[in-house]
Structures are given as structure tokens and as C-alpha cells.
């Protein structure tokens, strides 16, 4: 039986599920709307769709080393309670294993685990999202996890202990680039324009302002690059100086932190309780 767009729309309006999920459900029931809804409820698709709008800014970062590479994975949920749940962590580790086995792209991972994700959402009652997967190549690498929320992998030419310590530094200090010279030209230009404007507003003579900007730019690129930062274990040295003493070099790193860039909704607890009380009175 051919399924019409109107039928798909009606099922979508009634369940909140995605178009493809609705079409599939209707095809499986030969267009029987009520049976399709019942089946979707059983599978959890309708419940997962309702949760999809909820902000998932908590979760975990996982790391796994492969042959000459490592994979970092972020899987999100809504609360730190669920982030520690065995079912959630089991799901996240299953995704990690598949990613590490063949460097699967994010969208392919999402598609492969969508059915399991929907079932998990229905079971635990929170939105779940496979948000990021990153791969980093290197003959020699070290990884570090700070709790469940921060993961770092560093590659380079150094002994295991040195690379491990650098990974810990990256976790704490959040550098954006390996070296000051790696900072993109547009980032440098934007900051330089800002510093020139600040110096002019301070009323400095042009020659003094120019020297001040040079110094500020050196500080700026140093603070956002790994080798220019003060080394957390020996703050009187930069990371670059520490690496030079060790005859070591860092070639690349990746740092992931749970919820980066996600605007988490601020909950008003009192208002939430009041709303629940009001809702219970209407029931």
C-alpha cells in the first residue's frame, strides 16, 4: 500500500516523531494509523522524539587507542545522574568500539545506533545524543581523561611520561593551537585590530602604542598555544622550554570537554516546583 504525505504528516503531528520514522511505521502497518502509533509507542520512537528538544549538555567523554590512532567520543545526556548510569555508559562504549574499529564518520555512527539510542531514551527518560567523534593519528600518542568530562590525546616525539604530562596540561589549560605560529592569520588580525583600538583609546603616542601592541600580541598567541603557555607542573617554564629540555616535540592534540558550546538552560527550581504543584491541582 502506498503511503501518502498526508498520512505521514498526520502521524508526525500526533506523535512528534521524525518523517522517516512515521513513514516506516505506516508502511509496516499498511497505513493503519492507530496501529502505527501503538507500535511507535512500544519501540520508544514517540517518546524519544518528545525528548529530542531537551538540551543534552551533560554526558561523558570516552577515549580508545587503535593502531596508530586514537578516537575521542562525546555522548550527551541531560543530567550528571544519567551520565553515571550503567545503561548510558554501556551505550556510549558500544558506539566507541564501533568508531575505533574502522574510523566511522559521525553521521554514520548516529544512523547505526539510532535504534539503540531511541530505546535508551525510552528507558531512562532523557534525551541522548552522540555529539562528536574525533580521530587523531600518530605513531606515538598519550591519552588522559579528567573524570568523565574531559578527554585529551596528544601525539608527538617524546617518552610516554612526557606525553602523558603534556596531555594533563592540555586538559587543565585548554590551548587552542600547538605553537604560536599556528594561530591563523585572521585570528591574529582580529586581535591586533582590537589591541590597536585599545591603545589609541588609552591616548598612547603612536610609537608607544605600536610597541605595546607587539608585546600584547606575543602574549596573546602564547596564551592560546600549547608551547607558549606556562607549564602547569613547572610554572616558571613554558611548555616549549620544558619540551626542549626533554628533547621532545608535540605534533598535535585534541581536547574534548562535555557540553562545550552548548547553552545549558538555567533552571529556576522554585518556579519548577510551583509549576508541578499547579499541574497536579489541575489533574
Swiss-Prot record:
Region listing for Involved in Mg(2+) ion dislocation from EF-Tu, in residue ranges: 79-82
InterPro entries: EF-Ts_dimer_sf, Transl_elong_EFTs/EF1B, Transl_elong_EFTs/EF1B_dimer, Transl_elong_Ts_CS, UBA-like_sf
Keywords associated with the record: Cytoplasm, Elongation factor, Protein biosynthesis
Main location: cytoplasm
Molecular function via GO: translation elongation factor activity
NCBIfam families xref list: tsf
Family the entry assigns: Belongs to the EF-Ts family.
One Pfam family it belongs to: EF_TS
Record's subcellular location: Cytoplasm
A cellular-component GO term for this protein: cytoplasm
Biological role: Associates with the EF-Tu.GDP complex and induces the exchange of GDP to GTP. It remains bound to the aminoacyl-tRNA.EF-Tu.GTP complex up to the GTP hydrolysis stage on the ribosome.
Source organism phylogeny: Bacteria, Pseudomonadati, Pseudomonadota, Gammaproteobacteria, Alteromonadales
Protein name in the entry: Elongation factor Ts
The UniProt record lists the keyword Transmembrane helix: no
Amino acid at each position: 500500500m502506498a503511503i501518502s504525505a498526508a498520512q505521514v504528516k498526520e502521524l508526525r503531528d500526533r506523535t512528534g516523531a521524525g518523517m522517516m520514522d512515521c513513514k516506516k511505521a505506516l508502511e509496516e502497518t499498511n497505513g493503519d494509523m492507530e496501529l502505527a502509533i501503538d507500535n511507535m509507542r512500544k519501540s520508544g520512537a514517540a517518546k524519544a522524539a518528545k525528548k529530542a528538544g531537551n538540551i543534552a549538555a551533560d554526558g561523558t567523554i570516552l577515549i580508545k587507542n587503535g593502531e596508530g590512532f586514537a578516537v575521542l567520543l562525546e555522548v550527551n545526556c541531560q543530567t550528571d545522574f544519567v551520565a553515571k548510569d550503567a545503561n548510558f555508559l554501556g551505550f556510549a562504549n558500544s558506539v566507541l568500539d564501533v568508531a575505533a574499529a574502522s574510523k566511522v564518520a559521525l553521521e554514520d555512527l548516529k544512523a547505526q545506533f539510532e535504534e539503540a539510542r531511541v530505546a535508551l531514551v525510552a528507558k531512562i527518560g532523557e534525551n541522548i545524543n552522540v555529539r562528536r567523534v574525533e580521530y587523531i593519528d600518530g605513531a606515538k600518542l598519550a591519552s588522559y581523561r579528567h573524570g568523565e568530562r574531559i578527554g585529551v590525546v596528544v601525539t608527538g616525539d617524546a617518552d610516554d611520561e612526557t606525553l602523558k604530562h603534556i596531555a594533563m596540561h592540555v586538559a587543565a589549560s585548554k590551548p587552542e593551537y600547538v605553537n604560536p605560529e599556528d594561530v591563523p592569520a585572521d585570528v591574529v588580525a582580529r586581535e591586533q585590530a582590537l589591541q590597536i583600538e585599545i591603545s589609541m583609546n588609552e591616548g598612547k603616542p603612536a610609537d608607544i602604542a605600536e610597541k605595546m601592541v607587539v608585546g600584547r600580541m606575543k602574549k596573546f598567541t602564547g596564551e592560546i598555544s600549547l608551547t607558549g603557555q606556562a607549564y602547569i607542573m613547572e610554572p616558571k617554564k613554558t611548555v616549549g622550554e620544558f619540551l626542549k629540555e626533554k628533547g621532545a616535540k608535540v605534533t598535535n592534540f585534541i581536547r574534548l570537554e562535555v557540553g562545550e558550546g552548548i547553552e545549558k538552560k538555567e533552571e529556576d527550581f522554585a518556579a519548577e516546583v510551583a509549576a508541578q504543584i499547579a499541574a497536579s491541582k489541575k489533574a
